[in-house]
Amino acid sequence: MANHRNLAVLDAADSVADEINRLIDSRPRRVIHVYQLRKASQSIGANISEGFGRGPGPERDQKLRVSRGEAEETIRHLRANYASNRISRTDYWRLRNRLIAIVRMLSSLLREDYIIDPDLDDENTQSAAGD
């Protein structure tokens, strides 16, 4: 699996968090759920980094699941702001679609851990060859 410093999902998460910060800071009409929106968007990348810093295994998977939940929470806060006309349709859909892509990327990373285990495949191949 890739080093966390070279992960497209981490780059995407950082980019979304930066854009949300700019959006919040530039709105003439006050955005609602500011604290939660900032915190959730920043937590996506932070949890990805922490998970990959821990190495493969259940702790990494848990951090990736937390990141996925934070992305979903960010979408909910953006939706509330869009519904109350505090952010534009363009901003909402652009950020929402990018967050959906992040959720899918995280789900894919979680599936990789269970589908491909090179150590297990090597053991099974060697065992079958010896029979």
Predicted regions and their residues:
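Amphipathic alpha-helical assembly/interaction segments
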Residues: 1-131
